[in-house]
Amino acid sequence: MNRRNLMSRGLLAALAFAAPITPVFAQQPDLSRKAVVDDPVAPKRAGKTYDVTVVEFFDYNCPYCRRMEPVLNALLRSDPRVRIVYRDWPIFGPASREASRAAVASQWQGRHAAFHGALLTSPARLDSAGIKAAAARAKIDWPRLERDLRTHGVEIDALLARTDGIARAIGFNGTPALIVGSQVVAGAVDLPTLRRLVAEARNKPAAR
């Protein structure tokens, strides 16, 4: 049974699990933790200081990614020492890729957080018109965004390719997926579970 069938049956939440990621890095010599958590082009949100990083692999047209967004926002509000790294993994088709490219480009005008939230709260499955409507809600300067897409397009496409390679190397088969410290989480989780994983990572400095 594939992931999309599970999603259609509403069973995905029951399949969320956590497993150590350390063996994955050991088995993939070309994959480093730094490459996953510190990509210079991947958008990030963090306070002035942080000691735990949560990496999210997501697709803007994934319904369970939309459910994860308020959970991650609540975590950031309640824990200023957490950093979120957003790894766009547009696996739901061309519109998802278009949304990801636009969202990543919006960071050059300092509007990624607003645009990211607007895309994930869009009332319908995203298409080109829906992406532009979300940009308007997020107060995106659209001509500037188009310029940034031209200027940084190669960087953005390279980021998406790196993220796809990392996700496949780890063994993810769908979105959302998280890395919290040294734990891989496949599927959506609730806030108490996410807080527990952050606390566990905080107690293991080498895995932050």
What are the residue ranges of the model-derived segments?
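Extracytoplasmic thiol/disulfide redox context detector
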Residues: 2-93, 154-169, 174, 203-208
